Amino acid sequence: MTIRHQGQQYRPRMAFLQKIEALVKDMQNPETGVRMQNQRVLVTSVPHAMTGSDVLQWIVQRLWISSLEAQNLGNFIVRYGYIYPLQDPKNLILKPDGSLYRFQTPYFWPTQQWPAEDTDYAIYLAKRNIKKKGILEEYEKENYNFLNQKMNYKWDFVIMQAKEQYRAGKERNKADRYALDCQEKAYWLVHRCPPGMDNVLDYGLDRVTNPNEVKVNQKQTVVAVKKEIMYYQQALMRSTVKSSVSLGGIVKYSEQFSSNDAIMSGCLPSNPWITDDTQFWDLNAKLVEIPTKMRVERWAFNFSELIRDPKGRQSFQYFLKKEFSGENLGFWEACEDLKYGDQSKVKEKAEEIYKLFLAPGARRWINIDGKTMDITVKGLKHPHRYVLDAAQTHIYMLMKKDSYARYLKSPIYKDMLAKAIEPQETTKKSSTLPFMRRHLRSSPSPVILRQLEEEAKAREAANTVDITQPGQHMAPSPHLTVYTGTCMPPSPSSPFSSSCRSPRKPFASPSRFIRRPSTTICPSPIRVALESSSGLEQKGECSGSMAPRGPSVTESSEASLDTSWPRSRPRAPPKARMALSFSRFLRRGCLASPVFARLSPKCPAVSHGRVQPLGDVGQQLPRLKSKRVANFFQIKMDVPTGSGTCLMDSEDAGTGESGDRATEKEVICPWESL
């Protein structure tokens, strides 16, 4: 991409052309448009011609505008080729008289976006050369010779096409042939305009025509040439530097002032426009007693920074008074007041400055050279705002080269720098501005979290469990986690704590993440049984008697589903029991429950599908009797009498003697026949 790159090269992007086209279409309306009729031009009668006065009158009445605005709009329409003149084709303006005009065919409108190629223009020039027998305009001859050299390899094709078009044109009648010639000429006057005419289709950097410049066909006078020579001589006298030196100065300036840039480096103690803290304005007041350290350090950058700051000027004035040259800064301030003060008081202020600083024997007389004094005194005869610029510049350079360097080394500046305060950064409020907003770490993407969750589930499912090993399916795990909603530990005052529960009422489970100590996840009941099997065996060996059996998971589920305590039901045959178990699993486990809760022997389920909080529920709930129902896995194995544990993920746990009998170890799946 270059500096002259326009993008979408040479395509008319002017939106107003569409508005002009809509207006031209209204003009051609046979009922409400411009009045058109056959007009005789030379020896030919041209159809659908109109006069310039009729066009202007229609524009004024249609758009309700003045005659001057209508004339300007009409010139636009003609210059862009929507209307072309019949009598003076080169003069692309709309004359408010009886001059004849005609509408251009839509094929030649600028918005058709087909390029005006050199081949088409060469064919047009060759056809005119044949028709006029070599009599062309000067610029047309130059273009003809240039295109002949440029397209010499296919010039025979150009000549052949020109002859064919000329032969086809002779077969038309005289009126159509004349109208077509005028249309082509008007098109090429717009797209290949003669020298000295403005190309209306140029835009951007291509539009270099200045309407005020001297025309090409006019000769320059001696005065104009002398002015041009003087301009170039002054341009040669200007000092120039290399681009590398200029860029180096810009980089140095940026590095020097970067710490004082409130946008790039921030401001101390805080930005008052963001934090609503006005301490920054209080510390940086114009004549504050103790300025900030950053403000005092900035005075050492250059003399303009010092003299621009009111506090810096006050300190510098104190230094100049000690050196008996305070009148220099006073004169500079008086000149600034004259330059930017009221216009009505310019003469009065100029006289006061002259009497105080410039007159012989003045009270605060300044020391300037005689030449500058003569220029100043001569200008005071007719005072204006800038009459003292010469004297002001002289005093400014004197202070910059002499007094400024000594001020930076003086104890006044060093004491000011030592006493300057350095405010600490205060806590900012949340900001909506991007350059002052504190950058926060973005949270992980939900897609990544979902992938991690799926990977964890896949790893858990990949852990094979051998459920045929004896003595590994008993005893609840001491580390249990039951997920029932959002993650929040129960409060001590929760109505679900052990101290607040009533053993006679069902439990409503809150949506909480209830954890026991040292727990991480909520394992499946089979996995809990596998991990706790070794502890159960040791417990069975060392204890002679066991605690009374607590309710099983399915018994607790039956108790929570029924509104009253269930009564004992007779056992069903094995196959009927299998079908009943599978139907209840689909009805209760899949349809009624929002999630598949993994329950432990001490987590009774309730009818609303949530999980009861962990605790001493098993000891408080009464012994329940339920039907013997099979689940996906029915685990039958030897259970010690009065062990206080029950089978997990099963509804086989019965009551009475059937639950106390030792049975043979077997695994029954729902896809196998009992």
UniProtKB/Swiss-Prot annotation:
Species this protein is from: Homo sapiens
Domain notes per entry: In photoreceptor cells the DEP domain is essential for targeting RGS9 to the outer rod segments.
InterPro entries in the record: DEP_dom, G-protein_gamma-like_dom, GGL_sf, RGS, RGS6/7/9/11, RGS6/7/9/11_DHEX_sf, RGS9_RGS, RGS_DHEX
Biased composition (Polar residues): 553-565
SUPFAM superfamilies, sorted: Regulator of G-protein signaling, RGS (SSF48097), Transducin (heterotrimeric G protein), gamma chain (SSF48670), Winged helix' DNA-binding domain (SSF46785)
The protein's name in its UniProt record: Regulator of G-protein signaling 9
Tissue: Highly expressed in the caudate and putamen, lower levels found in the hypothalamus and nucleus accumbens and very low levels in cerebellum. Not expressed in globus pallidus or cingulate cortex. Isoform 2 is expressed predominantly in pineal gland and retina. Isoform 3 is expressed in retina (abundant in photoreceptors).
The UniProt record lists the keyword Lipid biosynthesis: no
Span of domain G protein gamma: 219-280
Record Gene3D superfamilies: 1.10.1240.60, Regulator of G-protein Signalling 4, domain 2, Transducin (heterotrimeric G protein), gamma chain, Winged helix-like DNA-binding domain superfamily/Winged helix DNA-binding domain
Domain DEP: 30-105
Entry-linked PROSITE patterns: DEP, RGS
One Gene Ontology molecular-function label: GTPase activity
Region (Disordered) residue spans: 533-573
PTM annotation, UniProt: Retinal isoform 3 is light-dependent phosphorylated at 'Ser-478'. Phosphorylation is decreased by light exposition.
Domain named RGS: residues: 298-413
Disulfide-bond pairs as recorded: none
